[in-house]
Amino acid sequence: MKRLILTRHAKSSWDDPLTPDHDRPLNERGKAAAADLGQWLASRDYVPGEVLCSDAVRTRKTFSGIAPALPGAPVLELKPALYHAGPDVMMAVLRHARADVVMMIGHNPGIAEFAARLVAHPPSNPEFARYPTGATLVADFDVADWADVAFGSGVAVDFIVPREIAG
């Protein structure tokens, strides 16, 4: 059994229009949301052993906000290929994962498309199709190796958006 925690980066800042997209940090709401997500993940024992993260600033800072709440220290792997990746690239990266529980942190629109294609049946949450900032899907796969994961084979275990935690 393998478990994927699929998280879109938290809310980023657009304060400086000259900041390149890749370098945009989180805004205050995003920082708070990342911390809330960390608490939510830890409270449900959704703890990754490995984190596959886009190398953009906002995805790295999302993980930095989540990490303090997690027991242990998951291995963080920055993956430039995940920056604005589509579902096929995301799947290729996932198939090289090693831990039983993996977190992937990426960007829309690719992450929403990837989530939709991964699970056999989408969660009932109306935000799933939109996959807003901080949205997190937890999905299980009945495989022994990540290399065997296929689109449509995941079972949605949980789905949350940050405002549902804080609100």
How would you name each of these model-derived features?
Residues A85, D148-G167:
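Functional cleft and adjacent loop/helix regions within the main domain
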Residues L4, A99-G106:
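Generic beta-sheet signal
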Residues M103, E113-E127:
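Flexible, glycine-rich active-site loops centered on histidine and acidic residues
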Residues R44-Y46, H96-D100:
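Glycine-rich phosphate-binding loop signature in dinucleotide/nucleotide-binding domains
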Residues K2-A81, P123, Y131-P132, G167:
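Active-site-proximal alpha-helix that buttresses catalytic centers in soluble enzyme cores
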Residues P122-V157:
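Domain-level recognition of soluble alpha/beta enzyme cores
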Residues A81-L94:
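Short alpha-helix plus adjacent loop in nuclease-associated cores
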